[in-house]
Amino acid sequence: GLADGIVVTPSHNPPRDGGFKYNPPHGGPADSDATSWIAKRANEILEKGWRSVDRVLGSDLLEHPCIHRFDYLAYYVDQLDQVIDIDAIREAGVRIGADPLGGASVDYWGAIAERYGLELTVVNPKVDPAWSFMTLDWDGKIRMDCSSPYAMASLRDAMTPDENGNTPYDIATGNDADSDRHGIVTPDGLMNPNHYLAVAIEYLFTHRPNWPAEAAVGKTLVSSALIDRVADSIGRKLVEVPVGFKYFVPGLVSAELGFGGEESAGASFLRKDGTVWSTDKDGIILALLASEILAVTG
C-alpha cells in the first residue's frame, strides 16, 4: 500500500536549517493546506515545551506494529534501468564522478556502480557532521547546493583538464543533501541548471519512443524561455505551472507530462515505458541522464 513520507533534511540549505519535509501518499510535495497545518501544530508543540509529546525508546520502535524496516536503496537501485539507459552508459565506458556532498545519496551511488558495472567513482564518500569537506558558498556559509559554483568548487577543480587536456572523469555530478537536486560538471565547468534542463528535455523526447505521443513538457513560470523554444522545436505542448514541483504531480501520474522541471535544478521524468517514475524531484536520475546523453550522442 501507499504511505505518507517524512524526511528531515536541510536540503540545499545550511545544515543548521534542517527542516521537516512531508510527502502525502501520491509521493509528491504536499500542498499548502497540509504544510500550514503541520507548521501550526509544530509551533503549538514547541510553545508547550514538548510536554504533550509521547516519548518512545528507540530500541522499542521496531516492536510497534506500524513500524518496520524497508530497503529503499535496493528497491530504488534495482529499478533504475527502467528510467535510464544504463546499458548505453556501461557500453560506452563513460567515466562518472558522483559527489553526494555528504548527503543521502552517498550509499546509493556506490550501489549503482556495483549493481550495473559502471565506471563510477563516489568522489567524496565521507559523511562528516561538521561538513569539513565542503567549500563555502558565496556568503561564507556551508550550503550543499549542487547548483552553486562555490559549493561545487572541489568538483569543478577536479574536472579542470590537465596540461594534456585529460580529466579523471568524462562527466561529474553532484546532489544536495536529500538528493532531489542535481548539478552537472563538464570540463568546461558547472552547467547552468536551465541550460541542462533544455538539453535533457530535447534528448528525452527524441529518445523515448514508448512515451505517449501527447506527453507535454512541464516547466515553472520562472524557468528559462530556452525550454519554450525546445518544446516548440520538438513539437510538444508546453505546460507552465506556478513555482513549486507539486503542480507537476497530476501530470506525471497520468503521463500527460513526460517531464517536469524547475529552474532550481530539480526535475523528474517518466520511465522508459511511459509510466510514472517519481512524483517528486529526483536528482540521481537527472545526474545519470547526463551520462546517458554523453554515451548516446557523444
Residue ranges of predicted features:
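Gly/Ser/Thr-enriched, mixed-charge loops and adjacent short helices
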Residues: G18-T167
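Ferredoxin-reductase
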Residues: G1-G28
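Conserved active-site and cofactor/substrate-binding residues in soluble primary-metabolism enzymes
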Residues: P29, D33-W37, D71-Y75, G103-Y108, ...
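General beta-strand structural signal in soluble alpha/beta enzymes
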Residues: I6-V8, A98, V122-N124, T173-N175, ...
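Short glycine/serine/threonine-rich phosphate/pyrophosphate-binding segments
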Residues: P14-D17, G103-D107, S179-H182, A267-L270
